[in-house]
């Protein structure tokens, strides 16, 4: 993938992708190679919840715990705190409550900053995290117009909440 991007003239700093590597993978051999690619994320941590806002808060805290464990794992493998933070992304699924979901994404971002603070990063930008918001499938299948409206509202809540990427299946 990296060779292909170089062949096509993509600057290393412009290549932004998440590889989605399994969480238990040994990526220590990739550390030096990825040094010039600051926007390549290795791991995606998902809250795996579809459309139930009441339960989503608990799943968000589980995602934070998984992120903290992966951060520790990367540091043990020799990554700096700052580089390890840049190699993670969170995939958060959205529900139908516009305001709750926007607030949840913002709260998640703040909670992650507190987790990162424990590791004492050198750069403040390490407190930020990539959030890939995912529009949830409706539990009740209505008319196509209703589903378009629901997806649009979820997308608005994701953007308002500060996501970096948005997946609309």
Residue ranges, per PLM feature:
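Catalytic alpha/beta active-site cores
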Residues: 1-97, 101, 119-122, 128-130, ...
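Catalytic core of soluble alpha/beta enzymes
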Residues: 115
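Generic recognition of stable, solvent-exposed alpha-helical segments in well-folded globular domains
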Residues: 62-69, 103-111, 143-154
């Amino acid at each position: 993938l990296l060779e292909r991007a170089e062949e096509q003239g993509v600057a290393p700093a412009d290549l932004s992708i998440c590889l989605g590597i399994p969480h238990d993978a040994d990526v220590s051999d990739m550390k030096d190679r990825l040094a010039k690619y600051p926007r390549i994320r290795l791991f995606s941590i998902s809250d795996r919840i579809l459309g139930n806002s009441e339960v989503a808060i608990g799943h968000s805290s589980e995602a934070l715990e998984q992120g903290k464990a992966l951060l520790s794992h990367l540091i043990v493998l020799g990554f700096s705190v700052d580089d390890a933070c840049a190699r993670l992304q969170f995939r958060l699924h959205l529900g139908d409550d516009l305001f709750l979901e926007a607030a949840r994404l913002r709260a998640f971002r703040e909670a992650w900053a507190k987790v990162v603070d424990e590791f004492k990063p050198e750069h403040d930008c390490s407190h930020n995290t990539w959030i890939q918001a995912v529009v949830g499938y409706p539990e009740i299948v209505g008319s196509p117009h209703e589903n378009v409206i629901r997806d649009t509202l979820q997308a608005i809540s994701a953007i308002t909440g500060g996501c970096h990427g948005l997946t609309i299946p």
